[in-house]
Amino acid sequence: MAWSEYKKNETRENIGPGAMVKNGMGQYGFFCDSDAGIKILGVQPSEFLPVPSDEIVATFVDIEQMIAAGWVID
């Protein structure tokens, strides 16, 4: 799925640790930045709110690479 420029810019402006992100295939994850770059952590179901799992579902060098791979803020 190709995201709109609006959605891509919203991601660039508002992304931060713990933000929920999604890709064009309907997969969700949590944004996590580290010294090694960006990690997208999986989502663990819970009774009230989704929480990050220990599973790393994707890694990126920077936000532009993340967006190019189809991940945007939800």
Predicted feature descriptions by range:
Residues M1-D74:
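Terminus-proximal functional modules
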